[in-house]
């Protein structure tokens, strides 16, 4: 049996959400857990996976086993009109078997997102990702205002989870506060999973 891990599951089209996933993974490791970073393949207009089984680069694709066996979950997506991107939704829609068995009940979870514009739907996207987690019975974590960067940020960061203003071309790097908030969220998730597992 493998050691406990936090699954950092995301979809990223231009790389901003992928970078957030890496920073959240750093926070998870600071919290004492292994971070297992996974992504999902793009989908076609027919709503089927259209990428090879193993990606040419970047994180491996997530499996239901990755999700079932995690000690906690960080879920990330770029914003698509205030919602999570369809590849992530497609993956989550296929988790009914885990819901039926209660595999995720009582496990901690957090969400993160990136947007092209400052007011591009960060919080509504985070809320859209929280809904399936609540249906699975997961314990939702956000970022408390005791985290100073949440009060100082001029870009991303919400009490619902980490966020990033990536710019219209998706190339704006995470700023100091966004980095801090990603790592803080990952660390909080790992520490909570540790407390729940003890």
Curated annotation (Swiss-Prot):
Alphabetical list of Pfam families matching this protein: FMN_red
Matching InterPro entries: Flavodoxin/NO_synth, Flavodoxin_CS, Flavoprotein-like_sf, Flavoprotein_WrbA-like, FMN_Rdtase-like_dom
Catalytic activity, EC: 1.6.5.2
Residues annotated as binding FMN: 12-17, 79-81, 114-120, 135
GO cellular component: membrane
Cofactors required: FMN
Cofactor binding note: Binds 1 FMN per monomer.
Keyword Nucleotide-binding set for record: yes
GO MF term list: electron transfer activity; FMN binding; NAD(P)H dehydrogenase (quinone) activity; NADH:ubiquinone reductase (non-electrogenic) activity; NADPH dehydrogenase (quinone) activity; oxidoreductase activity, acting on NAD(P)H, quinone or similar compound as acceptor
Keyword Ligase attributed: no
Keywords: Flavoprotein, FMN, NAD, NADP, Nucleotide-binding, Oxidoreductase
Domain Flavodoxin-like residues, every copy: 6-190
Catalytic function, reaction form: a quinone + NADH + H(+) = a quinol + NAD(+); a quinone + NADPH + H(+) = a quinol + NADP(+)
Gene Ontology biological process terms from the UniProt entry: cellular response to oxidative stress
Assembly mode: Homodimer.
Annotated NCBIfam families: flav_wrbA, PRK03767.1
Family: Belongs to the WrbA family.
Protein name: NAD(P)H dehydrogenase (quinone)
Source species: Pseudomonas aeruginosa (strain ATCC 15692 / DSM 22644 / CIP 104116 / JCM 14847 / LMG 12228 / 1C / PRS 101 / PAO1)
């Amino acid at each position: 049996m493998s050691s406990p891990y936090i699954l950092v599951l995301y979809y990223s089209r231009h790389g901003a959400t992928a970078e957030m996933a890496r920073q959240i993974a750093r926070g998870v490791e600071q919290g004492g857990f292994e971070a297992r970073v996974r992504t999902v393949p793009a989908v076609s207009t027919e709503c089927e996976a259209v990428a090879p089984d193993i990606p040419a680069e970047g994180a491996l694709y997530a499996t239901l086993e990755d999700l079932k066996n995690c000690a906690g979950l960080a879920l990330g997506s770029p914003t698509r009109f205030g919602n999570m991107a369809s590849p992530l939704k497609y993956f989550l829609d296929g988790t009914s078997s885990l819901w039926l068995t209660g595999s995720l009940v009582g496990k901690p979870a957090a969400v993160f997102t990136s947007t092209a514009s400052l007011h591009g739907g960060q919080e509504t996207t985070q809320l859209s990702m929280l809904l399936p987690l609540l249906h699975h019975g997961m314990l939702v974590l956000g970022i408390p205002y005791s985290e100073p960067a949440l009060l100082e940020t001029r870009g991303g960061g919400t009490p619902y989870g980490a966020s990033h203003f990536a710019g219209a071309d998706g190339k704006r790097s995470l700023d100091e506060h966004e980095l801090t908030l990603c790592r803080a969220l990952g660390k909080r998730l790992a520490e909570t999973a540790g407390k729940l597992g003890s």
